[in-house]
């Protein structure tokens, strides 16, 4: 049985989920990263929006998106802030499986449900299922909360937030900003309060990191309509480096144009 199917059954729900590491045969290992099913589906939907290929949407993307929705419809639980994903984490920072409603998971689930609703409208199918998703979206915690220093909160719990996501934490990951990029829930064209909070979080994370993390920062600044800052990040990411030691705040490119250190895809 493929790991992506077994992962959902192990969690007592239907649909599919996956592990941190997965191979082309449908198997994975190490640990679960449940919200990544929504992240995968984000790119399926984006492929449709760029191509407008209804055949692709109907035959390939939609059934995968619907399966991911089935998983979350069965896993979400009630909380004071609304429906939340229980026992989640914020890759790759902070404690594992201790808090429900982590921004990373909530933002991805909102994106998944919203895009799947749009898919049913485009394909003119599954009206009852669409209505179920719409009703769930109304009760869903969207993963957008502004914290004490004006940041977009990564965690619900203030103590965890203060310890792991403070204003001087220059961690490479921007998991709580996935609604800004590659998602589209946050934008200065939609709501300046949340886009300003995302900007504050970006400033806290800093402009120096690994190669891939600089690319993520660059894209986030572009989404905030700050071309000058995005250009600076582009220059930072193209700095020539020669070091072979593992470091997380000196990203750049080697002479062969591979990024690092460390090299990651």
Indicate where each model-derived feature is located.
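Beta-strand segments within the central parallel beta-sheet cores of soluble alpha/beta enzyme folds
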Residues: 57-67, 83-88, 232-236
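Structured mid-domain segments that build the active-site/substrate or prosthetic-cofactor binding neighborhood
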Residues: 43-46, 65, 70-75, 181
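Beta-sheet entry/capping signal
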Residues: 2-4, 62, 69, 81-84, ...
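Aromatic- and acidic-residue-enriched carbohydrate-binding clefts of CAZyme catalytic domains
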Residues: 12-27, 93-98
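Core alpha/beta catalytic barrel or barrel-like domain that forms the active/cofactor pocket
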Residues: 12, 17, 33-46, 81-83, ...
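Active-site core of glycosidic bond-cleaving carbohydrate-active enzymes
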Residues: 1-3, 22-25, 29-54, 59, ...
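Acidic/histidine-rich catalytic neighborhood
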Residues: 67-122
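Carboxylate/His-rich catalytic cores and anion/metal-binding grooves
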Residues: 1-13
């Amino acid at each position: 049985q493929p790991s992506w199917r077994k992962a959902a059954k192990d969690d007592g729900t239907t649909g599919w989920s996956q592990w941190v590491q997965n191979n082309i045969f449908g198997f994975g290992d190490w640990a679960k990263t449940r919200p990544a099913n929504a992240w995968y589906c984000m790119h399926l939907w984006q492929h449709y929006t760029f191509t407008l290929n209804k055949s692709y949407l109907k035959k390939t993307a939609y059934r995968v998106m619907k399966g991911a929705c089935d998983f979350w419809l069965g896993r979400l639980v009630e909380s004071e802030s609304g429906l939340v994903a229980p026992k989640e984490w914020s890759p790759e920072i902070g404690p594992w499986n201790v808090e429900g409603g982590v921004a990373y998971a909530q933002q991805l689930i909102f994106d998944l449900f919203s895009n799947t609703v749009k898919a049913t409208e485009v394909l003119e199918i599954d009206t009852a299922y669409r209505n179920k998703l719409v009703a769930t979206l109304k009760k869903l915690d969207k993963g957008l909360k502004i914290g004490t220093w004006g940041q977009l909160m990564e965690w619900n719990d203030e103590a965890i937030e203060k310890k792991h996501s403070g204003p001087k934490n220059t961690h490479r990951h921007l998991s709580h900003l996935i609604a800004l990029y590659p998602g589209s829930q946050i934008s200065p064209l939609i709501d300046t309060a949340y886009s300003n909070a995302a900007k504050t979080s970006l400033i806290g994370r800093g402009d120096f990191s690994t190669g891939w993390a600089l690319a993520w920062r660059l894209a986030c600044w572009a989404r905030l309509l700050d071309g000058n800052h995005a250009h600076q990040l582009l220059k930072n990411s193209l700095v020539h480096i020669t070091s072979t030691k593992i470091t997380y705040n000196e990203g750049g490119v080697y002479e062969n144009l591979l990024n690092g250190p460390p090299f990651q895809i």
